[in-house]
Amino acid sequence: MEIGLTHTSTLTVENKHLAIQAGSGDLEVLATPVMMALMENAAMLAVKEALDEGMTTVGGHISSSHLKPTALGKTITATAVLTGIEGRKLTFKVIAEDETGTIGEGEHLRFIVDRKKFMAKLQ
């Protein structure tokens, strides 16, 4: 695994992605939690192929600003760039954009875990 790994995830805003549907607001605009989930998805996919067999990553923290609204039917992208590696802790810069430019930005932390050991914690 190396600094600079990048992935961009894409989403077309559907009714289920709106703040009024997600319960995070009462307007028909992209919900902040949906934007943040797309950021997490991009980070997860940025490093997926670099992990050893049986390993995955889990989200640990996200700090994000939602800067501009996005309407129903518009396409958004979220790009994650791996900026730091400290043992199992991975740090990403995340940016969300639509056709008008940047709509959100922040930092996301993920942790490398063994799938089986992590899921065993549910027992």
Language-model segments: what does each one mean?
Residues 1-30:
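Catalytic strand-loop segment that frames the active site of acyl-thioester-processing enzymes
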Residues 2-8, 17, 85-92, 101-122:
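C-terminal binding/interaction regions
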